[in-house]
Amino acid sequence: MLGSLIVNFKLFSAGGAIMEVFSRSFKNGEEIPKVYTCDGKDISPHIGWEDVPEGTKSFVLIMDDPDAPIGTFTHWVVYDIPSQTRELLEDFPKVPEVSGIKQGINDFGRVGYGGPCPPRGHGYHRYFFKVFALSVESLGLPPGASRKDVELKMNGKILAQAHIIGLYKRD
């Protein structure tokens, strides 16, 4: 089974700390509950992170599905998350900006979270929730930026990254 191949990815920072991503909504390598998908309420799950490296000034979160038939599909882009923030709560608002935290456009063409919605009968897809610790307070992008623009601005500023993986399929 796909779940047995999945490990929690951690990256050592220069200071030796291990940044870790977790969720109270699902366990790493296990199925994402229906409420967080297009078959449910399509609300975002809780995502948290800990053991961030010294010097972290902001975070970026990117959720994607590398198993989509059209290539990697971006479900969520969140950036300029303040350094003191250690989680995004369940049902994070689908608006361009919340208390300085900005959200980009997903591949559904909308701002904010777009839950798992793989083609029926396509089997399990893996959904990566990636958190990046950055050395800058802001990427200098307006709300509604593309993933590509966010990744270009992150280049050379990543102190650490980690992710968890959730699974989902539609029969």
From Swiss-Prot:
<dbReference type="InterPro" id="IPR005247">
    <property type="entry name" value="YbhB_YbcL/LppC-like"/>
</dbReference>
<dbReference type="Pfam" id="PF01161">
    <property type="entry name" value="PBP"/>
</dbReference>
<dbReference type="InterPro" id="IPR036610">
    <property type="entry name" value="PEBP-like_sf"/>
</dbReference>
<protein>
    <recommendedName>
        <fullName>UPF0098 protein aq_1250</fullName>
    </recommendedName>
</protein>
<comment type="similarity">
    <text>Belongs to the UPF0098 family.</text>
</comment>
<dbReference type="InterPro" id="IPR008914">
    <property type="entry name" value="PEBP"/>
</dbReference>
